[in-house]
Regions:
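Flexible glycine-/small-residue-rich
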Residues: 18, 50-52, 73, 107-111, ...
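Extracytoplasmic assembly/pore-lining segments of large envelope/extracellular complexes
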Residues: 24, 38, 82, 97-102, ...
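An acidic/polar, Gly/Ser/Thr-rich interaction patch typically located in mid-to-C-terminal regions
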Residues: 35-62, 240-417
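A structural signal for the main folded, soluble domain(s) of proteins
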Residues: 52, 70-71, 93, 144, ...
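Short, solvent-exposed secondary-structure boundary/capping segments
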Residues: 92-109, 216, 374-387
Length: 417
């Protein structure tokens, strides 16, 4: 490859479409920076900074609230990746005493509409003979998504596990009408977004927007972590990874999460505790009579292996699902990190990344929890937040790229053996 072509290959490029059409060349030339943020929480968002010389763009018809906006990023001359599809939600012009006036254009994906208002309702299938039966969470997620004009996408393993667990819960409560009523999903004064976040959390899903393809911005992906363990991006410190700051802490960590619940049929209280076996990389579940709860906590060193007791109104059917959700939230925040690299459009919320050249403890597989892509006069950069999930423990360290840093004499050699 010749030098001119090599330089062109690494020329950052972006494309903006408003109302389905490429913006005029004059408007494109006035855009000073593009900032795109994506995360596992909240709607994805974009901010454009536009030079508003002579106030030429102040009342332009393309810059209106609710107008469709699409952003693509990448490097010329390669095809750009469609990164964002959403709507303009805010306009903020500035009129400085000196200097060039600016306009900031903010857009969010269509999930922001789901955050408006609140609803109170329940999701059940009514039968004449047996009364109300709870709808599976997969169906609930699909119904609420469809009401908001979104197409739900379910990962196979995540959907199957949800259906199996829901089926077990339904079978256990089949002969108990009161138990069936308690299992019915209720949206109690929540927005559709908050309700789906709660349903997703209790099933081990993450909600991310798929911006790719002709249906981009309308495909709501209920991401199952167990379906995505293969790294899509590999970064190496000293090469593609510009900087990296990991953090490991046992502050707030627990060995088990437990809850007490009453079983009327047995006239007895039980304690259910979910834990994590680090040696086997597997979940554990203990069920003991209520009087055994003190024995369970006594078996743990409360300084090294604390047990968190939940104070929530749970039943024998719903307790295991909620316990595992609470436990995983704690475990997956034990080792987190942040980093920065040369702009890479592949880095999105939910992406699995392999970090190399930072030792065994801090190297290996991570899940991206948020990413920011910025293109301005300084070029194209991507910064990200990430977490090391317990599921990655099933992948051998060598395959993860997590190896020790070797020091030979005065030479520091970072890499695989």
């Amino acid at each position: 490859m010749s030098m001119p072509n090599a330089a062109m290959r690494y020329a950052p490029e972006f494309q903006v479409r408003l109302q389905g059409e490429l913006v005029p060349a004059a408007l494109r030339a006035s855009i000073s920076s593009v900032n795109y943020q994506t995360g596992l929480e909240g709607a994805d968002r974009v901010e454009l900074s536009i030079f508003n010389e002579n106030l030429r763009w102040l009342d332009h018809s393309l810059l209106r609230l609710d107008n469709d906006l699409k952003i693509s990023m990448g490097y010329a001359p390669d095809p750009l990746r469609q990164m964002f599809v959403g709507e303009i939600v805010a306009l903020a012009p500035t009129f400085p005493a000196s200097g060039t006036p600016m306009i900031s254009v903010s857009a969010q994906d269509r999930r922001y509409r789901m955050q408006r208002g609140s609803k109170t309702r329940w999701f059940a299938l009514h039968t004449k003979c047996l009364g109300n039966f709870p709808l599976p969470d997969v169906a609930v997620a699909g119904l609420v998504s469809g009401e908001n004009g979104l197409m739900p996408i379910m990962d196979p393993i995540g959907a199957a596990l949800s259906i199996v667990i829901g089926g077990v819960e339904a079978a256990v409560s089949f002969s108990d009408p009161d138990a069936r009523q308690k299992m019915i999903r209720r949206q109690s004064g929540e927005s559709d977004y908050d309700f789906l976040r709660r349903v997703s959390a209790e099933n081990g899903w993450e909600m991310v927007m798929d911006h790719q393809g002709p249906m981009g911005g309308r495909r709501l992906h209920f991401l199952s972590m167990a379906d995505h363990l293969t790294p899509e991006v590999t970064l190496r410190y000293g090469q593609s990874l510009v900087d990296f700051t990991p953090r490991i802490s046992n502050v707030g960590q627990v060995a088990q999460v437990a809850v007490n619940f009453w079983v009327p049929a047995l006239n007895m209280e039980f304690l259910v505790a979910a834990g994590w076996d680090w040696d086997r990389s597997a979940l554990t579940l203990d069920i003991v009579p209520g009087y055994g709860s003190s024995l369970l906590t006594a078996q743990k060193d409360n300084n090294k292996n604390p047990v968190m007791i939940l104070n929530e109104p749970l039943t024998s059917e719903t307790a295991p699902r909620v316990l595992v959700t609470k436990l995983l939230a704690k475990l997956n925040n034990r080792l987190t990190g942040s980093g920065r690299c040369v702009g890479d459009p592949r880095i999105q919320a939910g992406t699995v990344m392999r970090i190399e050249g930072v030792g065994q403890q801090f190297g290996g597989l991570y899940r991206v929890t948020s990413a920011t892509h910025s293109i301005d006069s300084g070029g194209y950069q991507t910064s990200f937040e990430m977490r090391k999930e317990v599921w990655f423990g099933s992948v051998p360290l060598l395959e993860q790229g997590a190896v020790k840093v070797d020091i030979a004499g005065q030479t520091l050699r970072i890499g695989r053996p």
